[in-house]
């Protein structure tokens, strides 16, 4: 909840979180809902409405793909019809396609860029007109967008591009008092990292000063704080247990 201008009446913020059927996106949506805010969750899962209902009564779901222009238009129309506006947009939807340069296909490259970079651009473009002064965009980045890891050309390039987009939009939208920031999770316990071998997992944890993986709930808390920080824009917030300091 945030305070109304008179300082007395609490006002529920209106959130939209992409990639929210599981993982970090789901945790962000659940946290916002638990604190009294209204939430729209977006995901390709056809059961997204049921997932929304399981989070809370003020949560609704839209089954959509951020890589499809028509779907993004439909998302914006749903939000406008329900709420008439939007306060916080969290661009969390992500796709990881790994492989060395000699193995990645054009389809891998294009699909990753479409989800991780073009998707957030389309979402901001479609929804920024619904955001009042004080609105907030939180883009979810990745450490690989700042440090080179072999076999991560697609993912690394897409997340590096998202950093650039964050910087440009922060400046461009500041005149409307809309803030744009990036949260960069480190090695987090999600379905994506669950497939990593024990050996690889131990090697990564060995580089993290705090010597453990992060949780989706910890990432959600940071997204919540960044979304509500009124004098922060164009910032990159690493939430990685110190990993970036030790690479």
Model-inferred region functions:
Residues 21-22:
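Conserved glycine-rich cofactor-binding loop
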Residues 35-51:
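Conserved glycine-rich Rossmann-like NAD(P)H-binding loop of the short-chain dehydrogenase/reductase
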Residues 100-101, 105-113, 204:
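Substrate-binding pocket helix/loop in short-chain dehydrogenase/reductase
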Residues 124, 158, 166:
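Active-site helix of classical SDR
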Residues 129, 171-175:
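Alpha-helical segment proximal to the catalytic Tyr-Lys
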Residues 130, 178, 212-239, 244:
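C-terminal substrate-recognition "lid" of short-chain dehydrogenase/reductases
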Residues 142:
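Residue(s) in the substrate-gating loop at a strand-loop-helix junction
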